[in-house]
Amino acid sequence: MDYEDIEKLVFGGGSNSSAARASVGEITEQEHWLNVMKALKLPASDVARVRDEFFGGDIIDRNLLEFMRSLKPKRKVGAISNAWDGLRAYMEREKFADVFDSIVISAEVKVAKPAEKIYRIALDQLQVKPNEAVFVDDMPANIEACERLGMKGIQFADAESALKQLKAIL
């Protein structure tokens, strides 16, 4: 099994998949990883190792976080993430949860992007109107959804171009 196959097990599989169910809080992240391990025919005792190897190449963009942190004195900064129930603890452990005035995690609110409700939750928490908000995401469907609400959308391709677009809007 190659990386793409494992990535499909971890993140893909459609709306009834283990990943999708974990993303809206129907199952926990731990239950999802146990499902992945079962599909890989690996023992549950190897979950931590497999998870750490899978995410081992991920890098937190500290420059991007510092830019967002620099906005906070004058602007509200929020995050909307289609993520499992462990994200908030991860953000706190890695010391960047404080960058955000609001963090909306799909597993916690039981709805995922591109559903309108998740954007509305974030807007309500930040106490801003859609036309006052800028949303950055890598998925075109999520950008289209935010724009339908009246938010400005920036499709993330790389940090440099996203920052350039964001600075132009702000």
Where are these regions (language model features)?
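N-terminal helical cap/lid subdomain that shapes the substrate entry/recognition surface
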Residues: M1-R62
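Active-site phosphate/pyrophosphate- and oxyanion-stabilizing loops and adjacent acidic/basic residues
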Residues: L34, R69, R120
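Surface-exposed alpha-helical segments enriched in charged/polar residues
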Residues: K38, E66-R69, D124, E144
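Secondary-structure boundary motif
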Residues: K38, L42, S70-P73, R93, ...
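Short, acidic loop-to-helix structural element flanking the phosphoryl-transfer center
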Residues: A44-G78, E116, A159
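A mid-sequence interfacial segment
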Residues: R62, E66-F96, F100
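Asp-based, Mg2+/Mn2+-dependent phosphohydrolase catalytic module
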Residues: W84, R88-L170
